[in-house]
Amino acid sequence: YAKDLTEFFAQTPKPCLTSTKSWLNQTPYISRRRKKAQAIRAFSAWAAEHAITGFEWWRQVPIAKEKQLPQTTATKDDYAQAIKRTKNSRDKAIIETLWSTGLRRGELCALLAEDIDFLAGFVLVRTSKTGKPRIVPLSLPAKRAIRVHLQGRKTNSVFGITPNGVRLLLQRLNAPSAHAWRRGWAVHALRNGVSETSVRAAAGWTSGAMVARYTSALSGELAVEEFQRAWLEYNLLG
């Protein structure tokens, strides 16, 4: 916050609520405007803790709301097309793993050979965003693809690729981003009857907020399909 507060005091020597709002509105990007407003709010809290008066109005500084744009979700068709475009066993195994597990890029790249349990059918994610290890079920196509890829490999890393390498691979395959595959995995699982509790555990989410977001997206998707079927039946009958 130091940089934003330094800039703020330099440009508004005698700040008030009106001048502060004007200063914030000079920033075109909502994300930056939010951060600046948060810095001012944080200073207000610090001032209150240290019994410094005269800054109570800072708490009224509005924090701009970011627009929640629809996010891309990988579909069955994306999966099928990406598999067709792969040119080697490693790339195919990566696509199968993304579709089967919904792993984050960093988690995918960190997988070691001993993390794959082919008999039980799961992968062990040792390093995750939450810092807690977890197991994620592995589909039969993913197991087969990984087995083929690992044949003859001498390194312990399953894929031997960096997160940026995964990004470039997906671009080369004209496929959705890794996070879109994660969303697609969650929606596909929920669509096929996997419980929200199981999806949350496999994804490594500590709360149900993310699952609720995907459930909402799935509800909208199913509603569209139902309407399309109804219109098709209406047109056929008509």
Positions of PLM-derived features:
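Conserved tyrosine-mediated DNA breakage-rejoining catalytic core shared by Y-recombinases
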Residues: 101, 110-148, 209, 216
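Catalytic-site neighborhood detector that most strongly recognizes the C-terminal catalytic loop/helix
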Residues: 73, 127-130, 203-228
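N-terminal core-binding DNA-recognition domain of tyrosine recombinases/integrases
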Residues: 2-70, 149-153, 172-174
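Active-site/catalytic core of tyrosine-dependent DNA strand-transfer enzymes
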Residues: 139-180
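C-terminal secondary-structure termini that scaffold catalytic or DNA-interacting sites
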Residues: 229-238
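DNA breakage-rejoining catalytic core of tyrosine-based enzymes
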Residues: 53-55, 65-81, 130-140, 153-159, ...
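Basic, Lys/Arg- and aromatic-enriched nucleic-acid-binding interface segment
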Residues: 76-105, 109, 130, 182
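Short basic/aromatic active-site micro-motif
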Residues: 174-193
